[in-house]
Amino acid sequence: MLMSSKAQKALIIATPELISVRDADMTVSKLEGLHFDEIYLIINKISVEMVKSGEMMSIDDIINIVAVPLIGAIPDEKSVIHSNNIGKPVVLKTRSRAGMAYANIAKRLTGVKVPILEDEKKRFFRFGRK
C-alpha cells in the first residue's frame, strides 16, 4: 500500500523588495489553501542602513504583509558574498551576523528555543518605523 505524505512545514524566503514580499504573500495564500500546518518567514538580505533611511521595507512591514511568523532575518553583509566566492559556508564564520542568523534559523527549525538576538531587535526592528 502506498502512503501519501505531505510536508508539514513551509519556509517562505523573501527579500525586502516589494515584488518579493508580494510573491511571498501570494505563496502563503496558496500554502494555506493546501492546509500546511506551519508556515514560517525568512527575510534575506536585510540592510539596517537602508531600512533606517527609508529605502527598504522594515521587518515589521514585511511581517504585517506576509502575516506568518518570522523564523529569522539574514543581514545583507559582505561575509556572505565572500563565503560564496571562496566556497565556504557563512555559518562557519562564527563572528558573522549572517552566519549566526543562519545557525539560529536551523536551531529554531529543530525545535530549539532561540530568541531573536537583542542586537537584531535593536538594529532591525527599531529602524524603519516612522
Named regions from a protein language model:
Residues 84-100:
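C-terminal boundary of histidine-terminating zinc-finger modules
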Residues 21, 73, 91, 113-117:
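Secondary-structure transition/capping residues
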Residues 1-72, 76, 82:
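Conserved catalytic-core segment of NTP-binding enzymes
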Residues 95-115:
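Histidine-centered active-site loop/cap adjacent to the catalytic His
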